[in-house]
Amino acid sequence: MKSILWHNLKLCAHGDPNDTIADAAIAVNGDGTIAWTGRASDVPAGYVHWPREDLRGAWVTPGLVDCHTHLVYGGQRADEFAQRLAGASYEEIAQRGGGIVSTVRATRDASEAALFEQACARLRPLLAEGVTAIEIKSGYGLELASERRMLRVARQLGERFPVSVYTTFLGAHALPPEYAGRADEYIDEVCERMLPALADEGLVDAVDVFCERIGFTLAQSERVFEAAARRGLPVKMHAEQLSNGGGSALAARYRALSADHLEYLDAAGVAAMRASGTTAVLLPGAYYFIRETKLPPIDLLRRHGVPIALATDHNPGTSPLTSLLLTMNMGCTVFKLTVQEALLGVTRHAAAALGASDRHGSLAPGRQADFAVWSVSTLAELAYWFGRPLCERVVKGGVTVFTRDAR
């Protein structure tokens, strides 16, 4: 591609709506990285005569980052939604053989091609909202061949679509039926067979575990983290969603990229996360969908300076959500985040939760030229509207990959 000077735009370069430039320009190198950003009046002489692209005064932010999703799976779980409306809890449904395990059955039965086609339909609406980087977890196969299929599909999505895909191995998501009553043996399988094989195939960017009463214990979770450490892989954790089990402190001890959910996080866990630099990933879609009543400790996270990210947590059972903008709205209305916190939560802090701050989440020299162009008059509208298309253009690596009128 050729170098381009994007001009006549309002710039929020670092995901902070309190740090903007009213008349800005972005110089993009031919390799798709940022060369320079700043005031239009300050464009360096070396970029002044580059070919130009006029954005007609639109707002520009970094491309959005969805840092926690379960996008690849078979089937759906609308029947469980009806059960939940009738009064069944998430734990009760899981104990009846529903929940994650029901999706495991559908995923194991699906071909790789079928998994890919279903995931495409879930990914497209996110891309149309300005998402340029996404995390995709495994965890609905729970045996080597099916976990491999899920991670292969995630890689294929990154090859087929203009989005950076970060894969996470979540073999320790639930106990598969064939291991009922033998959780430690299943963790042996995860640590000694599944993770080494998948890592050797280049399918794993990070490792996650569901540490909860209906998931895995602290001791079992630590075994998974140790296996990841032996492979030099970063870790993250589903922690404190349904109870305070101390998972966040364990995650912090292993310097996890993120601890996610966190409704039952306590002060000790917050302090540990702050000390380790672990990002708090909040998932308001799941909170809303399962009608949780315990809010994450937002004020504690603020006081300790723990970075807060937001993500869709797209999954079939507790958050069938394919809108990161609606996630921002929920973060503000349900979790009482500010617009500043919400936008940082889907840009800079979300990139940190992926260990990808050097590539995503901010428009600065050397980073990928991934940005979204918005048809709004103020950035608060990104968290204000829901159900309304706001993204008019997506640029990935300096190339326009989506325009609203091209859909």
Swiss-Prot record:
User: Catalysed reaction per UniProt?
Assistant: 4-imidazolone-5-propanoate + H2O = N-formimidoyl-L-glutamate
Q: Which InterPro entries match?
A: Amidohydro-rel, HutI, Metal-dep_hydrolase_composite, Metal_Hydrolase
Q: Which family does it belong to?
A: Belongs to the metallo-dependent hydrolases superfamily. HutI family.
Residues binding 4-imidazolone-5-propanoate: R77, Y140, H173, Q241, T318
Q: The organism's lineage?
A: Bacteria, Pseudomonadati, Pseudomonadota, Betaproteobacteria, Burkholderiales
Query: Which pathway does it operate in?
Result: Amino-acid degradation; L-histidine degradation into L-glutamate; N-formimidoyl-L-glutamate from L-histidine: step 3/3
State whether keyword Cytoplasm applies.
Answer: yes
Q: Which gene encodes it?
A: hutI
The top EC class is hydrolase
Q: Could you tell me what this protein is called?
A: Imidazolonepropionase
What's this protein's function?
Answer: Catalyzes the hydrolytic cleavage of the carbon-nitrogen bond in imidazolone-5-propanoate to yield N-formimidoyl-L-glutamate. It is the third step in the universal histidine degradation pathway.
State the compartments where it is located.
Cytoplasm
Where Fe(3+) binds, per the record, is at H68, H70, H238, D313
One Gene Ontology cellular component annotation held by this UniProt entry: cytoplasm
Keywords assigned by UniProt, alphabetized:
Cytoplasm, Histidine metabolism, Hydrolase, Iron, Metal-binding, Zinc
Query: Which BP terms from GO are recorded?
Result: L-histidine catabolic process to glutamate and formamide; L-histidine catabolic process to glutamate and formate
